[in-house]
């Protein structure tokens, strides 16, 4: 359940930091709280900006309300998953997994320098980046544990997808090209169907979690 409160909660703290050589001030305010029965997590304006900074090609100067609201919805969903994930203490990323995930994140940008500059613009420290990466890995491991390990794709589903989706798609995109036989693309189709099922199961889980949780928007963005 989502409740919206008028912005009676004004300012938490004013952060001063340098961004691309120019000093900036960011007023950090409380944006929302999320409680899925484990604890109450606070989402701040800085959390939104950190989320945007980690999304390639997203503008950081004067972000639009749409961008901020997308970031807030994503963070709310992440908090819901994370609160569930932390009920399972064995879901802890290794140092290698953390390093690999961080390296993969950097590769989404044109260069390590661009990545570092974006972090500096929003005042994200190396420690905060590590915390965010660790949280993302915990969520990924939890979703794998909850959904991926139990997804079963039948041979009929694979055959149906090959006939009804894969073959027409190839014929439309590449007229005259011979469609690869089912056995050649079976693994690809199985992976596609598995990811679709996991996405559907995750969406259903989040719909239920949002209904059960206490989500309060303190300051609309």
Residue ranges with predicted function:
Residues 19-23:
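Sec/Tat signal peptide C-region and signal peptidase I cleavage site
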Residues 7-18:
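Bacterial N-terminal signal peptides
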Residues 30-61:
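N-terminal targeting signals for Sec/Tat export/insertion, comprising classic cleavable signal peptides
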Residues 1-6:
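Positively charged n-region of N-terminal signal peptides that target proteins for export
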Residues 25-37, 62-221:
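Peptidyl-prolyl cis-trans isomerase
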């Amino acid at each position: 359940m989502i409740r919206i409160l008028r912005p009676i909660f004004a300012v938490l703290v004013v952060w001063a930091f340098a961004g691309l050589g120019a000093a900036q001030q960011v007023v950090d305010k409380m944006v929302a709280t999320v409680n899925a029965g484990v604890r109450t997590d606070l989402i701040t304006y800085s959390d939104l900006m950190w989320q945007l900074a980690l999304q390639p090609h997203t503008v950081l100067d004067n972000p639009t309300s749409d961008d901020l609201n997308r970031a807030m919805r994503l963070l709310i969903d992440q908090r819901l998953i994370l609160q569930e994930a932390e009920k399972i203490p064995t879901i802890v990323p290794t140092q290698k997994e953390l390093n690999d995930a961080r390296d993969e994140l950097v590769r989404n940008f044109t260069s390590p320098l661009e990545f570092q500059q974006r972090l500096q613009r929003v005042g994200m420290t190396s420690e905060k980046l590590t915390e965010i990466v660790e949280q993302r890995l915990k969520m990924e491991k939890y979703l794998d544990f909850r959904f991926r390990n139990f997804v079963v794709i039948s041979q009929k589903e694979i055959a149906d997808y090959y006939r009804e989706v894969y073959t027409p798609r190839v014929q439309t995109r590449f007229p005259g090209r011979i469609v690869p036989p089912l056995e050649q693309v079976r693994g690809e189709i199985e992976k596609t169907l598995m990811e679709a099922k996991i996405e559907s199961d995750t969406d259903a889980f989040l719909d239920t979690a949002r209904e059960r949780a206490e989500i309060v928007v303190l300051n609309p963005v």
